[in-house]
Amino acid sequence: MAKMMHSRLPDRITLLGAFCTSIFLYGTASAQSDGSTDRGAYIAVTSDCVACHTAPGGKPFSGGLAMKTPLGTMYSTNITPSRTFGIGDYSEADFSRAVRKGIRKDGRNLYPAMPYTAYSYMTDQDVHDLYVYFMKSVQSVESAPSKTSLPFPMNIRGSMMFWNVLFRNDRTFQPDPSRSSEWNRGAYLAQGPAHCGTCHTPRGFLMQEKSSKDLGGASLGAWYAPNITSDKISGIGNWSRENIKTYLKTGHID
């Protein structure tokens, strides 16, 4: 299984290593450290913002990454604090609405390639700190990435309003009081900022995640996001904590 997963791994080991570091080395203590900018940097790594919002050879968060989907090719946006090409003119309320509801400052809908259905779980504090980080610590990039141009009728962004009615989740994460604080922290990260299900859950014909097959593995164009459920045969149920840590850092386990 490890070899199969390794053979289909995209060339983003460095990003996965940073992600692993954020979860296993920084941990909850770092997430609760003082300073919105430091916490925002932690949330940005946990949310893997740079992976989609940075094109190969491009500047961090400047957008332009081409994402091929069954609906057409989408390009990620510039999310640096540029007031002309990025999100520099976004208020915190504008930012929160884009991140958690998929609605831009101008009122137009984002496509669910942006995982706002997962980010809706994020706490107000995490969104606040993420906003502070982008506005104060990210370098502004004064350039516009390629624009997404999808065929009719998906080029009508207003159609996303109906999709959102059916599939958008507007609830923040609710801890399970019967579980440990460690379990709840892991559930929050997996379901919210880390948005594991965005890649590892198969999608229906309307491109919605199939909740009945949550984290069961999904095809993503030229590569495959494997089953990461607790199933001991097809999933990672037999993996130890160290196995998971090693895989996230290196892309394989022995």
Predicted features, each with a name:
Residues 28-45, 162-191:
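Electrostatic cytochrome c docking/interface patches
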